[in-house]
Amino acid sequence: MLNTICIYDYGTGNYSSVENALKKLGRKVLISNHMDILKKSDGIIFPGVGSFPTAMNSINKKKIKNQLIRLIKNKKPILGICLGMQILTECSEEISFSKGLSIIPGEIKYNISKKTNIGWKKIHFISSKSKYHSLNNEYFYFLHSLSYKGPIKYQKAITKKTFE
């Protein structure tokens, strides 16, 4: 069981929401961007809210990008929430081109229409073997203008509605 979870602090994010949820689950929560604390934690959460360039600039300024990548590749459990998932990819075109951590192949691109996708849409799981397949054809709320573009094996669910 993951008892001590570190929420990565890149200077922006929904820390308090994530922290409160983890505490309700009985987990010890740390918020940090120091490698010694990240290494000692049982898992790392990269929170959402903020911009890709801001998050990556924070990681690059700390000069820990390579150490962070090694830690993740050595099987440290991680969870990326929204922006946190995005920085795990190779790059993003949000605001300006920025390189990510390259843990997940692919990139974050603006939606074709460049309009924000807002609203309730049905989600379709690509594999019927997904542990979340019972949620197939259920509605989820979306609010984004960027999407992940990468190998199909990293895409677990899609929405088929176009952006209006």
For the regions a protein language model found, what residue spans apply to each?
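Structural signature of beta-strand start/N-cap positions in the alpha/beta core
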Residues: 28, 43, 77-79
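Pocket-forming structural segment of enzyme catalytic cores
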Residues: 91-163
